[in-house]
């Protein structure tokens, strides 16, 4: 399964807006995606140190519940929160035929934000 960066951004935004730091964001709470895809992305984000998540897998299926953003998660979301910046990042990466990697997204987002400043 490939990483879906729009889903990753959606997860981070949803976790940030969650008022209660003790409640879980279940993989079924993200609309528009099947729970297995969301659970896989929770696992990726947890392994990357971007979110805190619990492994709630059963014998039948892998599943995760997201708890909160880490410091690194907040820092990354700060770079891609703005819709204009996010769309510019995606179009820049695509126009330059770059792979959408975590480091490339951070670099392009930083450059995009810098270009917006006076």
What are these regions (language model features)?
Residues 86-118:
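Membrane-inserting effector segments that mediate pore formation, membrane fusion
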Residues 2-30:
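Short amphipathic alpha-helical interface segments
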Residues 53-56:
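Beta-hairpin "wing" of winged helix-turn-helix
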Residues 64-93:
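Short, amphipathic alpha-helical interaction segments positioned at domain boundaries
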Residues 5-9, 39, 67, 71:
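Non-catalytic, well-ordered alpha-helical scaffold segments
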Residues 39-49:
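Basic amphipathic alpha-helical segments that dock to polyanions
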